[in-house]
C-alpha cells in the first residue's frame, strides 16, 4: 500500500474522537447493509422490478438487531487495531443472527424471501463491514513494521474505572506504542471483567506476581484520585521489579485533546506523591475580571509570572503585556503563548522595574486594567550575599511599580509575596515584607486597588529545591539536605498562579491574602520521594545532611500569631490582619536604606521588617 495513503488514513483517524468514530462506523455499516441488499436483489431479480417495501423493512430490522448485538458484546460497532479474530467472529455472528432474526419476523408476515437470498446478503454484508476494519489493521501493521522503533512494550494498566476508560480511548490511537496485556484495579471484585476488550486480571496488590507471570515492562496508573501513599506503594513495587511506572495525563488534558496523541501517559512526578489537589476556577468571576481587558505581568518570564500569563489567557483578555528584564525568558514565553492561544495581543516588553520612567512610559502606552507584580529576587542565600540588590529590586522595584500604577490610574495591582516575609531572619524575606507594606501603603492614598498574595515554596520553579535534587540524583548523588528536621510549605506552579488570580479578583482594600498551603513537608521526606521517583533506593543515592545556610529557617510560617486570619474569601484563600504603615513613613525608611550597604543594610531591613509584624 502506498505510504502516503497509509499516512493519510492514520492522520484522518487522529482527527476523530471516540464518539465520531462510532458514528462513522454506524453510518458505514448501514450503508454496507443497504448496498448488500441492493446487490443481492439485483442478482436474484435483476433491474426489472423495483425493490418492494419488504426489503427496506428487512434491512432496517437487520441493522437494528446487529447494532444491539454488537453493543452487547462491547464492540460499539468499532474495531480497533488491537482487535482479535474473536472480535471479527462476533461481527460475523452479529450479521448472521440479526439477518436470521429479521428474516424470521418478515417471513411470519411477508413470506417473500428466499433462503439463498438471505445467505448472499449475510456474506456480502459481512464482507463489506469487515473489509475496512481488516484493512485498518494491515495499515497499522505496515506502519509499525516500517518504524522499527522496538518500543512495543508489554504493559499493565492500573485502574478499571472512569480514568481507565478514558485512557483506553487514547490508547487505541494508531501511533500508540503500547501492548496492553491486562488491567489491574484496587477493587479485586472487578477481576474477570473487560474494559475495551482488555481483561481485568485482579488487584494491583498482586502486581509483583502478575507482572512476572506476564513479563510486564511498563505500568501505567489511570486513577486520577489515587491517594499519594498508593502512588508511592505502586512505585516501590515497580522499582523492585525493574518496571517503568507512568500515569495518564490529567483528565481535562485528555478530554481537550491537549496531550501528545498516541502516547497517553506521562512520568509520575513529585506532585503526585505530595497529593496537592487541583483548584477549581470561579469561571464567572474571573471572566468578569479578565475578559476583554489589558493585563500587564512583571517578571513574565519567570515561573510564576509565565504561568499567570497562561492562566489569564484562558479568559480571553484583549492584550497581555509581558514585562521582564531577561530577554531570553520573555522571548520563550512570548512564542509559547502566541502558539497556544489565538486572538490575544501579546506584547513582549524588555524593561527593568528599577527604572521608574520606563515603567511609567509602558503603563501609559498600554493602559493595563490589572498589573500582576511577579518580578523579584527570591533566592535566600544569594540575597544574603547581595543585600543591596535585594533592596533595589524587591523594595525600590515594587515601589516603582506601585507608583506607576497610581500615576497611570491602573485599576488594580496584585503583588506576589512569600511566607518568608513572616518573622524574616533573612534579607530576602525582609524585603518582601517591606514590599507588602508599600502595597498596603499605596492603597491608603491611591484610587487604584492594591493587594498582596502570600504563599510558600512552589514546586518546580527555578528557585525550588526540586531541580537541585533532580540534578544531584542524575549525577549519582548524594542528595544534600540542610537539616533533616527542616519543613517547608509547597504548592504547584499552576495552583499558586490560579490562587493569585482568584485573590486579585476579590481585592477591595489593600488586603494581604494568605493561601492555604496545606501541611508543611519535611525536606528530607521530599528528597526520599525524589529518589524513589528516579527508580533508585537510598542505598544507591544517599541523602546527606549539610547544615543550615545563612538566613535559612528550620520552619516557615504563613503568618505570625498577631496576624490572625480575618476571614476566608474562598476555598484556600484567607485574608490576614497585617499591619499597615503610612506611605510617608515607608518613604522615610527607604531613604535611610539607600545610603546603607552590606551588613548594615541587611540588619536595618531585617529589623524594620520584624517591627512591622505587630498590629498597632
Regions found by a protein language model. Give the residues of each.
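Flexible, Lys/Arg-rich cytosolic regulatory linkers and terminal tails that connect or flank
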Residues: 2-7, 11, 231-294, 406
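Signature of alpha-helical transmembrane segments in polytopic membrane proteins
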Residues: 1-150, 240, 247, 371
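A solvent-exposed beta-alpha-beta segment
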Residues: 45-49, 139-255, 328-332, 339, ...
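Strand-loop microenvironment adjacent to phosphate/nucleotide-handling motifs in alpha/beta enzyme folds
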Residues: 21, 280, 285-289, 441-458, ...
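Hydrophobic/aromatic anchor residues within beta-strands of the central parallel beta-sheet
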Residues: 348, 390, 450-453
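Proline-aspartate-enriched helix->loop->beta-strand connector
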Residues: 211, 215-217, 317-318, 363, ...
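Conserved Rossmann-fold NAD(P)-dependent oxidoreductase catalytic core, especially the SDR/UDP-sugar
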Residues: 241, 256-257, 373, 377-436, ...
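N-terminal Rossmann/SDR dinucleotide-binding element
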Residues: 258-271, 275-367
Amino acid at each position: 500500500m502506498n505510504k502516503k495513503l497509509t499516512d493519510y488514513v492514520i492522520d484522518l483517524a487522529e482527527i476523530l474522537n471516540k464518539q465520531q468514530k462510532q458514528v462513522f462506523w454506524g453510518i458505514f455499516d448501514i450503508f454496507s447493509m443497504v448496498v448488500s441488499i441492493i446487490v443481492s436483489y439485483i442478482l436474484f431479480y435483476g433491474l426489472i422490478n423495483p425493490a418492494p417495501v419488504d426489503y427496506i423493512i428487512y434491512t432496517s430490522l437487520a441493522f437494528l438487531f446487529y447494532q444491539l448485538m454488537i453493543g452487547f458484546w462491547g464492540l460499539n460497532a468499532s474495531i480497533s487495531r488491537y482487535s482479535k479474530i474473536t472480535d471479527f467472529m462476533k461481527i460475523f455472528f452479529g450479521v448472521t443472527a440479526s439477518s436470521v432474526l429479521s428474516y424470521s419476523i418478515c417471513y411470519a408476515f411477508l413470506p417473500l424471501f428466499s433462503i439463498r437470498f438471505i445467505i448472499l446478503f449475510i456474506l456480502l454484508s459481512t464482507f463489506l463491514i469487515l473489509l475496512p476494519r481488516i484493512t485498518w489493521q494491515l495499515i497499522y501493521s505496515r506502519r509499525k513494521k516500517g518504524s522499527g522503533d522496538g518500543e512495543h512494550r508489554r504493559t499493565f494498566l492500573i485502574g478499571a474505572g472512569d480514568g481507565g476508560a478514558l485512557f483506553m480511548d487514547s490508547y487505541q490511537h494508531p501511533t500508540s506504542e503500547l501492548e496492553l496485556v491486562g488491567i489491574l484495579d484496587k477493587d479485586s471484585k472487578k477481576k474477570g471483567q473487560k474494559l475495551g476488550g482488555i481483561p481485568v486480571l485482579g488487584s494491583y496488590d498482586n502486581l509483583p506476581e502478575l507482572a512476572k507471570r506476564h513479563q510486564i515492562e511498563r505500568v501505567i496508573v489511570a486513577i486520577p484520585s489515587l491517594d499519594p501513599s498508593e502512588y508511592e506503594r505502586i512505585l516501590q513495587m515497580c522499582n523492585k521489579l525493574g518496571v517503568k511506572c507512568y500515569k495518564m495525563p490529567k483528565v481535562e488534558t485528555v478530554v481537550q485533546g491537549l496531550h501528545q496523541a498516541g502516547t497517553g501517559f506521562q512520568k509520575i512526578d513529585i506532585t503526585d506523591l505530595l497529593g496537592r489537589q487541583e483548584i477549581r476556577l470561579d469561571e464567572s468571576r474571573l471572566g468578569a475580571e479578565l475578559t476583554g481587558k489589558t493585563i500587564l505581568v512583571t517578571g513574565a518570564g519567570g515561573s510564576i509570572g509565565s504561568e499567570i500569563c497562561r492562566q489569564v489567557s484562558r479568559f480571553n483578555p484583549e492584550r497581555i503585556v509581558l514585562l521582564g528584564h531577561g530577554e531570553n525568558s520573555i522571548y520563550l514565553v512570548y512564542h509559547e503563548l502566541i502558539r497556544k492561544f489565538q486572538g490575544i495581543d501579546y506584547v513582549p516588553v524588555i524593561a527593568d522595574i528599577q527604572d521608574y520612567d520606563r515603567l511609567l512610559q509602558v503603563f501609559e502606552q498600554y493602559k493595563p486594567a490589572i498589573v500582576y507584580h511577579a518580578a523579584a529576587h527570591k533566592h535566600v542565600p544569594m540575597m544574603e550575599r547581595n543585600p543591596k540588590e535585594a533592596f533595589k529590586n524587591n523594595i525600590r522595584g515594587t515601589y516603582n511599580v506601585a507608583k506607576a500604577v497610581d500615576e497611570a490610574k491602573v485599576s488594580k495591582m496584585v503583588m506576589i509575596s512569600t511566607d518568608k516575609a513572616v518573622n524574616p531572619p533573612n534579607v530576602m524575606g525582609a524585603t518582601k515584607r517591606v514590599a507588602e507594606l508599600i502595597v498596603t501603603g499605596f492603597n491608603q492614598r491611591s484610587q487604584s486597588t492594591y493587594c498582596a498574595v502570600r504563599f510558600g515554596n512552589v514546586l518546580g520553579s527555578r528557585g525550588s529545591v526540586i531541580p537541585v535534587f533532580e540534578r544531584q540524583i542524575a549525577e549519582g548523588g548524594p542528595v544534600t539536605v540542610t537539616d533533616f528536621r527542616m519543613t517547608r510549605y509547597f504548592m504547584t506552579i499552576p495552583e499558586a498562579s490560579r490562587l493569585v488570580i482568584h485573590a486579585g479578583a476579590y481585592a477591595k482594600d489593600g488586603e494581604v491574602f494568605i493561601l492555604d498551603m496545606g501541611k508543611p513537608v519535611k525536606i528530607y521526606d521530599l528528597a526520599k520521594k525524589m529518589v524513589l521517583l528516579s527508580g533508585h533506593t537510598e542505598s544507591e543515592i544517599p541523602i546527606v545532611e549539610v547544615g543550615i545556610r545563612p538566613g535559612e529557617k528550620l520552619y516557615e510560617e504563613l503568618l505570625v500569631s498577631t496576624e490572625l486570619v480575618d476571614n476566608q474569601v474562598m476555598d484556600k484563600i484567607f485574608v490576614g490582619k497585617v499591619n499597615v504603615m503610612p506611605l510617608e513613613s515607608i518613604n522615610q525608611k527607604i531613604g535611610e536604606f539607600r545610603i546603607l550597604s552590606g551588613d548594615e543594610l541587611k540588619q536595618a531591613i531585617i529589623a524594620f521588617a520584624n517591627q512591622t509584624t505587630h498590629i498597632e
